[in-house]
């Protein structure tokens, strides 16, 4: 049978067309903006890379600690612009308390809102970061599995978040 023959020194060609067709959403559909209230939203960023560790790619996301689900996520550099994109996705939601770590841009962006800066109140999202690292090898710090393109990096991680949190 032609499908069972060994490759004899040639690696099989991977077809990434199915991954490139993915169109993951960036906001959950489980929580209805305007009708549901998010009491405690934890925000954090997670480091990843594409091709080489010098080409950093950051995942910013918000986590509803009571529903134990990701509310929204964006990819980009670790800048105010990326944080602003995440905040614009979260603007339709009624969030009572924001909980973040001590990154200074959170404090400047959440000025005027009820904002708690504490490692104690970001334990759930930090645990979720660890779960993402365990489930997705491309997010591991020391791994042979890494993303070769920004497009596939964003789509694969976005698709994982869609399956686990948004549907």
Swiss-Prot record:
Q: Which GO terms describe its molecular function?
A: DNA binding; transposase activity
> Which Pfam families does the entry link to?
DDE_Tnp_IS1 (PF03400)
Q: Does the keyword Acyltransferase apply?
A: no
Keyword entries, A-Z:
DNA recombination, Plasmid, Transposable element, Transposition
Lineage: superkingdom: Bacteria
Q: Which InterPro entries has this protein been placed in?
A: Transposase_27, Transposase_27_IS1
Any one Gene Ontology biological process term?
Answer: DNA transposition
The similarity comment for this entry is: Belongs to the transposase 27 family.
Say what the protein does.
Absolutely required for transposition of IS1.
According to UniProt, the name of this protein is Insertion element IS1 protein InsB
What organism does the UniProt record list as the source?
Escherichia coli
